[in-house]
């Protein structure tokens, strides 16, 4: 028996999640898998009533009692800063150490692609985004807020452990799934410290995978190449913020966020959050 925790989210998220669960039921029946789903009302309505996105003990229960988590879209105009969405999504990503953000880029129908004369074969690659570090860890602060001397600091945190495990996972995925190349993207020509670490770790890891072609692209060059010639890519790996931006570009080339899938994974523990 596989147990799935379902968090339908807000607005259209609830409708999409309900439809997705019908697909899950059919898939489970087709492949002979016993699935039990439990729904959790973590979203804007509950947050407005309680002031809490993830209640006490929820993280531990989701980690220990379920095989996977389905999460619908979060967002409500009544909560302008998306505080509940950040608490739920980032709480799960960081709390469950879901360091792999897996974003397959696959064009299902040529009519959905805004690029001229692209076929379904042209868009078929995978982006791996580091999911627990970088500029999204929330380290920073504001000094002298509201004055002419206001200063805002936002730290970009990169650890050798975090960088190595996502780069290594990208290479392992490429090897297992028959992908021929891995591209690492950063901005080390400007971000001389954090992304120098990315460069050095990439060079160290790539020599262990001589059967896989690998190269480096600065992120601005990567975005141009994705638009110009997406067929050249098999696997892309990058940091948290750049991955967030690049995968939205890739989603639009597929036809929009509505047809772009996303998984947040920890291959070491087996935890998985699917959006």
PLM regions and their residue ranges:
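Short coil/turn connectors at secondary-structure junctions
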Residues: 1-3, 33, 64-66, 97-98, ...
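Glycine-rich phosphate/diphosphate-binding loop of Rossmann-like nucleotide-binding domains
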Residues: 5-22, 26-28, 147-220, 232
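Buried hydrophobic positions in well-ordered alpha/beta secondary-structure cores of metabolic enzymes
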Residues: 10-13, 67, 128, 170, ...
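N-terminal beta-loop-helix "entrance" segment that forms/cooperates
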Residues: 30-57, 224-226
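Glycine-rich phosphate/nucleotide-binding loop
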Residues: 46, 225-275
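N-terminal glycine-rich phosphate/adenylate-binding segment common to multiple enzyme folds
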Residues: 47-153, 241-243
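Short, small-residue-enriched loops and turns at beta-alpha junctions
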Residues: 77-78, 189-193, 224-225
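Short acidic loop-to-helix transition motifs that present clustered carboxylates
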Residues: 110, 217-224
């Amino acid at each position: 028996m596989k147990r799935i925790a379902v968090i339908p989210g807000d607005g259209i998220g609830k409708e999409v999640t309900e439809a997705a669960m019908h697909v899950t039921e059919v898939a489970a029946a087709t492949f002979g898998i016993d699935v039990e789903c439990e729904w959790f009302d973590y979203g804007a309505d509950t947050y407005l009533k309680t002031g809490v996105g993830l209640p006490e003990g929820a993280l531990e229960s989701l980690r220990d009692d379920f095989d996977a988590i389905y999460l619908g879209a979060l967002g409500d105009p009544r909560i302008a800063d998306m505080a509940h969405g950040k608490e739920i999504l980032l709480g799960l990503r960081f709390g469950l150490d879901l360091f792999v953000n897996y974003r397959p880029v696959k064009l299902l129908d040529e009519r959905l692609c805004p690029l001229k004369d692209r076929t379904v074969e042209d868009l078929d690659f995978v982006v791996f985004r580091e999911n627990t570090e970088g500029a999204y860890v929330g380290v920073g602060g504001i000094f002298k807020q509201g004055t002419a001397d206001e200063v805002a600091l936002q730290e970009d945190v990169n650890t050798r452990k975090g960088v190595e495990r996502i780069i290594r996972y990208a290479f392992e995925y490429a090897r297992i799934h028959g992908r021929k190349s891995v591209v690492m993207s950063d901005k080390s020509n400007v971000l001389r410290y954090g992304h120098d670490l990315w460069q050095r770790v990439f060079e160290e890891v790539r020599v262990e995978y001589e059967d896989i072609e690998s190269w480096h692209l600065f992120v601005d060059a990567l975005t141009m190449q994705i638009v110009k010639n997406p067929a050249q890519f098999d696997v892309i790996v990058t940091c948290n913020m750049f991955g967030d931006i690049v995968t939205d570009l890739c989603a639009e080339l597929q036809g929009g966020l509505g047809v772009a899938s996303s998984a947040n994974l920890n291959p070491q523990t087996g935890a998985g959050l699917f959006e």
